[in-house]
């Protein structure tokens, strides 16, 4: 990925360190909004119709939509993805992790607008008579686009990088990342098959960053020597866990797409 190396040299200094912390912080704020005043969340969704009518903050605020309604599950999810995200950032470097996460977000936004455009074109005659239908279609689309699959892309990327890393499922059952990733992939494929086109586009576009990552890293010769060193160094550190610092001590209690 020579283009990425060149891009990093040019704008790498603008990368956001500890991006996963900011992402988890956004989820937390969204959870607070949803708890205190649920109506606020309707103004945060990724609704193309409302964005095109001036509510441009939705291009960013959809990231605040809570991925969990249960506080306990939210805390577990936050701990799990914090450790995975920080591990990927240490392995890839801050810039590349930024590209991966922001790339997933950009693809998600593009997917929402593409789907809205298709639906609008298919229902143009009806919308001309019932303008409110455009907003309803947009809200329907927005419900399928969230950070759930962005989170999954983090999990899948980590599983590809460290397939033999072990986690404790339900804090009891030891299981390797590759087996959990297979379960995630099967569940996602099933969801893709049974969903309508809105769901399919949402899943595909949200995971497009992972698809690109997977096909561009299957051959590790594509890694630069510096990247290989970072990866090997992190693996070495993970083999020597310190109290409270190892991913091997983390479990995720409910196995579904987040």
Residue ranges and their predicted role:
Residues 1-11:
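Short, Lys/Arg-rich, polar N-terminal cytosolic tail immediately upstream
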Residues 12-110, 115-128:
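N-terminal TM1-TM2 helical hairpin plus the immediately adjacent luminal interfacial "cap"
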Residues 81-82, 155, 182-191:
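Hydrophobic, membrane-inserted alpha-helices
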Residues 114, 129-165, 173-179:
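Membrane-interface micro-motifs in multi-pass membrane enzymes
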Residues 145, 149, 195-209:
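Loop-to-transmembrane alpha-helix initiation sites
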Residues 156-157, 207-217:
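Alpha-helical transmembrane segments and their membrane-interface exit regions
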Residues 222-244:
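Short, highly charged, low-complexity non-transmembrane loops/tails of multi-pass membrane proteins
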Residues 253-258:
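Conserved small/polar residues in nucleotide/adenosyl-binding loops
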């Amino acid at each position: 990925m020579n283009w990425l190396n060149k891009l990093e040299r040019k704008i790498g200094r603008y990368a956001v360190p500890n991006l996963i912390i900011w992402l988890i912080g956004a989820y937390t704020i969204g959870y607070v909004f949803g708890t205190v005043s649920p109506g606020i969340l309707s103004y945060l969704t990724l609704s193309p119709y409302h964005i095109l009518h001036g509510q441009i903050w939705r291009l960013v605020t959809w990231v605040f939509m809570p991925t969990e309604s249960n506080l306990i599950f939210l805390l577990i999810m936050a701990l799990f993805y914090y450790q995975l995200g920080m591990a990927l950032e240490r392995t890839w470097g801050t810039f590349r992790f930024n590209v991966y996460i922001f790339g997933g977000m950009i693809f998600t936004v593009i997917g929402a607008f593409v789907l809205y455009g298709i639906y609008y074109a298919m229902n143009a005659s009806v919308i001309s008579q019932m303008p409110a239908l455009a907003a309803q279609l947009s809200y329907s689309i927005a419900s399928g686009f969230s950070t759930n699959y962005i989170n999954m892309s983090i999990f899948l990327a980590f599983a590809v990088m460290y397939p033999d890393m072990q986690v404790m499922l339900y804090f009891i059952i030891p299981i390797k990342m590759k087996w959990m990733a297979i379960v995630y992939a099967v569940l996602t494929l099933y969801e893709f098959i049974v969903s309508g086109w809105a769901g399919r586009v949402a899943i595909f576009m949200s995971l497009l960053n992972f698809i690109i990552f997977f096909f561009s890293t299957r051959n590790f010769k594509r890694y630069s020597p510096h990247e290989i060193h970072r990866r090997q160094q992190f693996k070495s550190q993970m083999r020597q866990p310190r109290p409270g610092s190892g991913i091997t001590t983390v479990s995720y209690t409910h196995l579904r797409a987040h």
